[in-house]
Amino acid sequence: MSGLTHFDESGRAHMVDVSEKPVTARVAVARGAVKMSAETLALVTEGRAEKGDVLGVARLAGIMGAKRTADLIPLCHPLPITKVALELTADPALPGVVVEATVKTGGQTGVEMEALTAVSVACLTIYDMVKAVEKGMEITGIRLLLKEGGKSGRFEASA
């Protein structure tokens, strides 16, 4: 299974040994969105959702999700995360909320999964907090936008 680092020579899943890799500065940025009706978006942006501050709670949930990534994704290394920041932006053209997460560490492996988990958990939290008024919302477009640091260098997603 050449190229797939989470499998050994026999094809069995294993956690990659990063003990010999140098500690370097690493950053990852991910993005996703929750599409909803304009009416539901107004509830969110005007602070009228029954469960409270949707965007504030989703931001905290995303931060918590990034910190718990190694508990959720079986082969992820627990990392000393040094920064998690989430931007949640209402987009009337979508309509919906765009979520972008930036995660940083000084470590031996990257924080791509932490950034993707932060976005996913924030989007799920938005859905949870307003599902009572709209069950047909769509979580969409979750992807890695940027990865820097480590042996493989810089990755930037195409537009």
From Swiss-Prot:
It comes from the Bacteria. GO terms for molecular function: cyclic pyranopterin monophosphate synthase activity. Keywords: Lyase, Molybdenum cofactor biosynthesis. Substrate binds at L75, C76, H77, M113, E114. Catalyzes the conversion of (8S)-3',8-cyclo-7,8-dihydroguanosine 5'-triphosphate to cyclic pyranopterin monophosphate (cPMP). Its EC number is 4.6.1.17. It comes from Cereibacter sphaeroides (strain ATCC 17023 / DSM 158 / JCM 6121 / CCUG 31486 / LMG 2827 / NBRC 12203 / NCIMB 8253 / ATH 2.4.1.). Pathway: Cofactor biosynthesis; molybdopterin biosynthesis. It is an enzyme of class 4 (lyase). Homohexamer; trimer of dimers. It holds the Pfam family MoaC. GO terms for biological process: Mo-molybdopterin cofactor biosynthetic process. The gene is moaC. Gene3D superfamilies: Molybdopterin cofactor biosynthesis C (MoaC) domain. Belongs to the MoaC family. CDD domains: MoaC_PE (cd01420). The active site is at D128. It catalyses: (8S)-3',8-cyclo-7,8-dihydroguanosine 5'-triphosphate = cyclic pyranopterin phosphate + diphosphate. InterPro entries: MoaC, MoaC_bact/euk, MoaC_sf, MoCo_biosynth_MoaA/MoaC, Mopterin_CF_biosynth-C_dom. This is Cyclic pyranopterin monophosphate synthase.
